[in-house]
């Protein structure tokens, strides 16, 4: 079974990783 808390943690992790990837990409393009 998948808990609502597990879904929330997965979404939060995906959001953080996306933000880090965007920041890293911007630094590389400068």
From Swiss-Prot:
Chain segments annotated as transmembrane: 7-26
GO aspect biological process, one term: photosynthesis
Coiled coil residues, start to end: none
The keyword Chloroplast is assigned to this record: yes
Keyword annotations from UniProtKB, A to Z: Chloroplast, Membrane, Photosynthesis, Photosystem I, Plastid, Thylakoid, Transmembrane, Transmembrane helix
Membrane topology: Single-pass membrane protein
SUPFAM superfamilies (alphabetical): Subunit XII of photosystem I reaction centre, PsaM
Subcellular location: Plastid, Chloroplast thylakoid membrane
One GO CC term, this protein: chloroplast thylakoid membrane
Disulfide bonds: none
Main subcellular location: plastid
Stated family: Belongs to the PsaM family.
HAMAP family linked: PSI_PsaM (MF_00828)
Protein name (database record): Photosystem I reaction center subunit XII
